[in-house]
């Protein structure tokens, strides 16, 4: 029987072993790309965008999610790992590199098993069984924080920051992150924590401000300090709306007509300002521009008017101050005002900002980051954000596990023991899962320039003898009780890392056909030039 073409011309299809090999190669390449960034001694990557002269054109980072988000990936299996890393970053904030590397190692082991003629469904079944064993052993080893949650939060923050650019000042930033998270009082609302980056100074000059900072200033001749502020937050144009919206043109036959038009425009502006002042507010914050004439009217009324607050900033400001963003001013009685005890002007380096103190959302605060270059500030922000996410996750479920490779070897050892009880080819897949987990501490040692074979075998021996808190002391290059060194991690982060990697691997293993649709044909333009 002749083959029948069911796909359009130019559509591409890979089947069976070819499709599986393509998936393995793409996903493993992603893991190899980021594995050199893993651990406290991991290296950084320089990422250059298509236009390196643009703002943010060059990034220096070792954050797995940032690296994978910034590179263009064409392989579909590689895209699965990129999406998985993004999810890990969104859910728990840390472990983005670990989850990618673990998934790549699981696929390497799966590739070996496929080459031994073991069916992918058998591998998936073995991986599922191994995942259950790993999750159970991790749960048994976890410890509740109890009353000493602040100490645990500090240790977790130090561990998280230990592999970041902030590692040299991790004690300072750990205190800063924990103070910020504890102000949230368990709400987990990270929108209440604002991070402001200011060039200049050194990283250890960064600090936590207990007010909300806005990188804007009031208009000329307006109050620079307001107590007991009643704040109206708006997103409204302050010029003549219809002329701007409809792009109207006006033709006049004399200078007097121009003066009449300007007077009419001023009258419309004054009407809008009068409506705003009818709300009896003493502070007006607008997302859009406030022109010179309305600014003068606000100054005459002794009202602080702030213009051009960016959308994200004004959304967060409304949340923090307890107000709502309005766009019309016809019903003052329905407007929800923001409030705070004090608005004042402060200096950070050479820049002036406004600080809102005593805000309605009491847990709100601002972290001011200092640094020598924009790249340092950007990477510091990413690192601090990761730490804040991990701490918020831990506050919700206060369980910790040992870090520095201890948890991975614990799970690997538990899987190796249980694999002996599994019959058939599935046992090979269970053992392979354990070997993949053991690769994480191996890579951490390799990145630190240590003898990974020696250290990991010694670590296995310690765990076989029941000492499950033993991990790798990277600074001394030896096996040690890492809980005594304060190297602990959030149970949720580790659990999410193992589960996500196993699920992504299973999804890729199920693939036996890759179909690329034909490019969309452009309609031919027959119009004359």
UniProtKB/Swiss-Prot annotation:
Keyword RNA-binding: no
Organism from which the protein derives: Caenorhabditis elegans
Encoding gene, per UniProt annotation: cct-2
Keywords: ATP-binding, Chaperone, Cytoplasm, Nucleotide-binding
Gene3D superfamilies, sorted: GroEL (3.50.7.10), GroEL-like equatorial domain (1.10.560.10), TCP-1-like chaperonin intermediate domain (3.30.260.10)
Family: Belongs to the TCP-1 chaperonin family.
UniProt-recorded Gene Ontology molecular function terms: ATP binding; ATP hydrolysis activity; ATP-dependent protein folding chaperone; unfolded protein binding
Gene Ontology BP term (one): protein folding
Protein name: T-complex protein 1 subunit beta
NCBIfam families for this protein: chap_CCT_beta, thermosome_beta
Origin: domain of life: Eukaryota
Organism taxonomic ancestry: Eukaryota, Metazoa, Ecdysozoa, Nematoda, Chromadorea
Subunit structure: Heterooligomeric complex of about 850 to 900 kDa that forms two stacked rings, 12 to 16 nm in diameter.
GO CC term (a single one): chaperonin-containing T-complex
